[in-house]
């Protein structure tokens, strides 16, 4: 009898805490090649204002320093502000259109974003250019249970499929989560056909095009699309949290009415049920 009472008290003393609803989405934002987190944040000032009611962006800087540009003077030192998520050429550089190359440093970047994702408790992904390529890979890895990152949605601007050999099998199954794909009709760095090919790896991609080049647009003509996308994502996110809270509450009730007490508690347990 004493053993049963002790077990019951132990169960009730550490109930599963309810998850506090988040008022905004928390989105991990991945910059492009030769960018960094601070620079990307600065470039997205207008975009952040558009979505500020519904979402907060968490910017992270890639761990690898990109080498000097090919036309740099001899002896030029690498700029620590120019970063890369990985390198897909044997000379230690990156080019989105390169095919059948390596993915040097990819695992280091994967570990970094997994760490930040967990620390910041993010729920969605956003990426630009190489960062959007990375987002596409993360979505696929998540679907196959190969990363701790579990995005509810993704936003990919000027994205493309990775041409690295180790990533070629990442696009065999379509990604199921909601996605918004943004690209410029006049993009000469990542042609729109490459962004369209990445969008085709998702089951129901939402497409937003603009007449410009290689950038994430944030003009009045795009505002409504952004607002509606993130408002809908927030609604689904909050509904999921409510279900999670209800499930946790039901679990606590089941514990409180376990076999030791059959729903009747001793006086010694009153402090556990004060709330």
From Swiss-Prot:
Enumerate the Gene Ontology biological process terms.
response to retinoic acid
Which Enzyme Commission number(s) are on file for it? 3.1.2.-
Leading EC class: hydrolase
Domain of life of the native organism: Eukaryota
Spans of biased composition, class Polar residues? 7-16
Give positions of region: Disordered.
Answer: 1-21, 253-275
The active site is formed by: 129, 187, 214
UniProt keyword list: Hydrolase
Keyword presence, Hydrolase: yes
Q: Coiled-coil regions in this chain? A: none
Q: Name one GO cellular component term.
A: nucleus
In the record, what terms sit under GO molecular function?
A: hydrolase activity
Stretches of Acidic residues bias are at 266-275
Family, according to the entry, reads as follows: Belongs to the LovG family.
The protein, known as: Esterase AAEL000016
Q: Origin organism of this chain?
A: Aedes aegypti
Lineage here is: Eukaryota, Metazoa, Ecdysozoa, Arthropoda, Hexapoda
């Amino acid at each position: 009898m004493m053993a049963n009472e002790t077990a019951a008290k132990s169960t009730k003393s550490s109930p599963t805490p309810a998850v506090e609803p988040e008022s905004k989405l928390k989105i991990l934002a991945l910059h492009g090649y030769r960018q960094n987190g601070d620079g990307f944040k600065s470039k997205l000032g207008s975009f952040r204002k558009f979505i500020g009611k519904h979402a907060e962006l968490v910017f992270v800087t890639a761990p690898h320093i990109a080498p000097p540009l090919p036309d740099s003077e001899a002896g030029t030192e690498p700029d620590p502000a120019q970063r890369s998520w990985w390198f897909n050429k044997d000379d230690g550089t990156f080019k989105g259109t390169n095919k059948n190359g390596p993915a040097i440093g990819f695992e280091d970047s994967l570990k970094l974003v997994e760490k930040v994702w967990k620390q910041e408790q993010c729920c969605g992904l956003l990426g630009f250019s190489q960062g959007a390529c990375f987002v596409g890979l993360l979505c696929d890895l998540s679907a196959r249970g190969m990363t701790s990152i579990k995005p509810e949605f993704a936003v990919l601007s000027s994205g493309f499929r990775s041409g690295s050999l180790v990533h070629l099998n990442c696009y065999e199954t379509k990604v199921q989560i909601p996605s918004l794909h943004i690209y410029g009709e006049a993009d000469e760095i990542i042609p729109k056909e490459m962004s369209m090919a990445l969008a085709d790896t998702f089951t129901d991609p939402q497409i937003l095009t603009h007449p410009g080049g290689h950038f994430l647009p944030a003009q009045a003509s795009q505002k409504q699309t952004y607002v509606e996308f993130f408002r809908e994502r927030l609604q689904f996110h909050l509904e999921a949290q409510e279900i999670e809270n209800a499930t946790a509450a039901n679990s606590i009730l089941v514990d409180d009415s376990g076999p030791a007490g059959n729903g009747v508690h001793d006086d010694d347990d009153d402090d556990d049920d004060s709330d």
